[in-house]
């Protein structure tokens, strides 16, 4: 599971309040904080340094999977599912070192999680970095919904 430290929670909460959300307490109930946290960490590792649209796309794929009965029913379960997101399963550190970038990643995840953006991936449940592998074996028979920067 993607763990939330107290420092990280403080960063997340300050961002929610500083962005002036009309109802930030609605996000702080139940599994919402964990879901938003998992999505933000996923964006950090999957699309750090990419455009806001590409970061939104990564978050949208996660929520599209949550909405699809073939996948787990929460963002954290989708992200940590066996071999789905490479950063979670590789042997490298998952530490977040760039808090400025991470704040932007949280914002991208928040836009998707609170349904404040269009589905830029048009319902897609998969993507891959086409500069690394084009296409991966599991994607050979799939229809391309969109290409955004380094992701298809």
Which ranges hold each PLM region?
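Hydrophobic membrane-insertion alpha-helices, especially the h-region
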Residues: 7-18
């Amino acid at each position: 599971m993607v763990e939330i430290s107290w420092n990280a929670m403080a960063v997340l909460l300050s961002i929610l309040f500083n962005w002036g959300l009309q109802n930030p307490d609605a996000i702080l109930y139940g599994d919402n904080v964990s879901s938003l946290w998992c999505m933000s960490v996923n964006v950090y590792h999957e699309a750090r340094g990419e455009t806001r649209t590409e970061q939104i796309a990564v978050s949208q794929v996660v929520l599209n999977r949550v909405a699809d009965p073939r996948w787990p029913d929460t963002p954290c379960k989708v992200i940590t599912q066996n071999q789905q997101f490479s950063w979670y399963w590789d042997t490298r550190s998952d530490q977040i070192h760039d808090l400025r970038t991470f704040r932007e990643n949280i914002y991208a995840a928040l836009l998707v999680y609170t349904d404040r953006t269009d589905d830029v991936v048009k319902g897609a449940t998969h993507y891959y970095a086409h500069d690394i592998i084009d296409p991966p074996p599991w994607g050979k028979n799939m229809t391309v919904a969109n290409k955004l920067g380094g992701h298809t």
